[in-house]
Design a protein with these regions (language model features):
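Hydrophobic N-terminal alpha-helices or hydrophobic patches in metabolic proteins across all domains
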Residues: 1-207
Length: 207
């Protein structure tokens, strides 16, 4: 699924990685898109903001893969530029997603984990989301990244989720029972976003 080597990973670590991948996927495909849709709507661009966000995320993944290609590697400068642009574009959506998780989960624990542990992740934007998720659910996230599987003829591939530099975040050991809690957290956040969109639409119509 994620092209990583999980052959010698304990069960709890596999559960942890599934939670991390799933939460980040929900952000990149749903909540980040909604955030940029709202930004685009406020700027009078309609749904262009949502399209812009998805294209930016895709471009970053594309150039990251091209950088590792053995036959036609891309320019390292271009890859760095795409990564830096993505960090800027994803800065606000990552924090709106983390705030949404905090509102529908354990607010104080999520904010505390956000403030104290987000910086321990190599990717600060992903770190904000994962730290807030860990606090909102009371589950232990973060730790060593899985080793990616390189395609034939390609060099090492960067990990999809950056690991924590040191110990894991505090919380319960990840279990399969946490999957239903993650699903509930995501659905409650979707409902929160829908409510926000309804309020924005009413404000626009009545204003």
């Amino acid at each position: 699924w994620q092209q990583v080597d999980a052959s010698s990973v304990p069960r709890s670590e596999i559960v942890r990685h599934v939670i991390e991948y799933s939460v980040l996927a929900a952000h990149r495909h749903v909540f980040g898109v909604l955030a940029w849709f709202c930004i685009g709507a406020l700027l009078g661009l309609g749904p262009a903001g949502a399209v812009f966000f998805r294209n930016a995320e895709y471009a970053t993944r594309y150039w990251r893969r091209k950088e590792q290609a053995a036959d036609q590697p891309s320019s390292p400068a271009l890859c760095r530029a795409a990564e830096q642009a993505w960090q800027l574009i994803n800065w606000l959506p990552a924090r709106t997603t983390a705030l949404g998780f905090a509102i529908v989960g354990s607010f104080e624990d999520a904010i505390d984990a956000w403030r104290n542990h987000a910086a321990r992740f190599a990717d600060r934007n992903d770190g904000v989301i994962l730290a807030a998720t860990a606090g909102a659910l009371g589950v232990r996230l973060g730790g060593t990244s899985l080793r990616p599987l390189a395609p034939d003829g390609a060099g090492p591939v960067p990990a999809a989720v950056a690991g924590v530099a040191g110990d894991s975040l505090p919380g319960e050991v990840p279990r399969t029972a946490h999957f239903s809690q993650v699903v509930g957290l995501v659905w409650r956040t979707v409902a929160l976003w829908l409510l926000l969109l309804v309020l924005l639409t009413l404000a626009h119509v009545l204003g």
